[in-house]
Amino acid sequence: MIIRVILALWLVALSTGCDRTPKADKTVVLANDGIFSADLTDHYALIGRTSGPAELWQLKPRALLHSWKHLEDESGIVHAAISGNERYAITAQRDSIAWWRIADGALLNVWSLPGIGSVSLSHDGLHALIGLPDKAVYFALNQGRTLYAFAHDKAVLTTALDRIGHYALTGSEDSTAKLWDLTNGALIYSWPHHNKLATVALSDDGQYALTNAALSQVFIWKTSTGKVYKDVGPKLLTLSAARFSHDSKYIVTGRTSQRIDLWRVSTGKLEKLWRPKKEDAWRPSAATILSLSFTDNESKIWSIATNGYLQRWKK
């Protein structure tokens, strides 16, 4: 009996006292049954599950604004994105993409595309970068046509666009990340990695690109030179989300192991880390961070994980 009591006390201490990372100042459960895809902005969260509709949530005050599905299809939403100006959103099933207007929830159009692996939405919400089995396409949503096709040897798994509409960044299963010029569709740089790409990101001003391959180093590149500016964190790391601050001074990253890190771009050094809430403190399993966003004049950070927990952190 005494041994059991000691063991119980030790487990409580382990689950509460040993984690001295800062706690979230706000925690909300958006989906009790978990989520598969998500995107965050300052004011909204767009979430998708493996079946059923996508949900657009207003964050302050919290309210479900829209529930979206692609026509009558019950397939799950595998990717989601909100435009930087918060006027439009896109949702992707495995073989179709839908364009939505946030103000009234209207479905603007649906297109069939096979094997969608990633989606990114331009700041104005009028263009999408869509990862496909052997390329990415830069698609004019308001015109319903492809402007550029960006070739890869294998599936494009992760994509990013800068705020000013100058660059597109694609990461592929072929172990390359490629930077593209959106003024003419030309390839600017091709950056080889040792494994398939897990996450890419671009700063708003287009000065910096982040790339990370599975179980590999995180790199920050200068887009003006194509050279590595800083390498970040441990050498064996897999990111599941990344977002630059609007002033490009910081980048916040999320791991598949349910950890959030804040890095200073100029030094590549870790400034702060957080460990988001687990569903069950007694279980070792962790949820993957799906999306991150700076908020409140960049003084705080939103995060959302596959367990459905939306949390806010003080920077």
Regions found by a protein language model. Give the residues of each.
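WD40-repeat beta-propeller superdomains and closely related acidic/aromatic-rich repeat-like regions
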Residues: I2-W10, G17-K315
